[in-house]
Amino acid sequence: MRLDLNYGRDSYPLELRDDWDVTVIRKPAMPLQPDPSLAVRNALAQPVGASSLANEARGLKSACILICDITRPVPNGLLLPEIVRQLLDAGMNPDDITVLVATGLHRPNEGAELEELVGDPWVLKTVRVVNHFARDDAAHVDLGRTPRGTPVKLDRRFVDADLKIATGLVEPHFMAGYSGGRKVIAPGVAHRDTITTFHSARFMAHPKADNCILEGNPLHEEQLEIVRMLGHMLAVNTVIDEHRRLSFVNYGEIIASHLQAVEFTQRYARVPVGRRFKTVVTSAAGYPLDKTYYQTVKGMVGPVDIL
């Protein structure tokens, strides 16, 4: 038997002997959007817990759009052109629109890598695209502390924007339950003091800081506290299949829209297996998810429960 695992930009061929007892575990096939661009436009016009993007932007002077860094395969080239066009149509000046790469404590994305990340040359030419730097003290606003004592310091460019939009990918996350939404803000554009506090053992060692768990997950709950300290924010959430094709997109108030995206993706994220295995062969799902050793760890922790 031959199987191909997603690996790097291509795949890794795996030859399995016929006399081996092999179980192939796949998640259910996800529905695909036949016209991804139309799906994005429809999402921006049909909000969850908010007004349409055009209405939200009307009369406001500035906007900051968060995008994940190169370690996440978010379809930015699909999302950003439509978001930026609608902000311009609402009367915003291009100089007052910032696309902020939510690097967390990762390195900045620059040059050809930034072009690949943004996915559209018109966006790069039209609005300002910049990286977040978590170690730059002066670039952050101190909003105080959460009830758990986490210091909340966030990128000034996001905090000061009239319209705040987080874009991202919603999928299982081995600490925060699910990625996307509030996670793009913290740790995405948080100061190192904020990130290192809730990435500490006090949070990460909690039994509910795990894949597919939101209720009782201290990381998720801390992220929600931080979001609430900022006030009204919007999000564009995507779900993609294993071939990076768009399956789901929505837009709206950041918490409500994220929960709707979680509800969709959890139908496909969990696969009942019913037994444990001595050996599991898997991958980190290919580029860019296996671009760094840290991200590759996610491929290791995924099958832990069936070993």
For each predicted feature, which ranges?
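C-terminal catalytic subdomain
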Residues: 290-307
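Membrane-embedded hairpin module used as a gating/binding unit in multi-pass transport
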Residues: 210-288
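Glycine-rich phosphate/diphosphate-binding loops that line cofactor/substrate pockets in enzymes
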Residues: 48-64, 89-95, 271-279
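Short internal beta-strands
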Residues: 95-105, 237, 307
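N-terminal amphipathic/basic leader segments beginning at the initiator methionine
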Residues: 1-44
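Conserved phosphate- and dinucleotide-binding cores of soluble alpha/beta proteins
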Residues: 146, 154-241
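An acidic, phosphate/nucleotide-engaging active-site surface
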Residues: 109-178
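Short glycine-rich or small-residue beta-strand-to-loop segments that form or flank ligand, phosphate
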Residues: 62-73, 98-104, 281-283
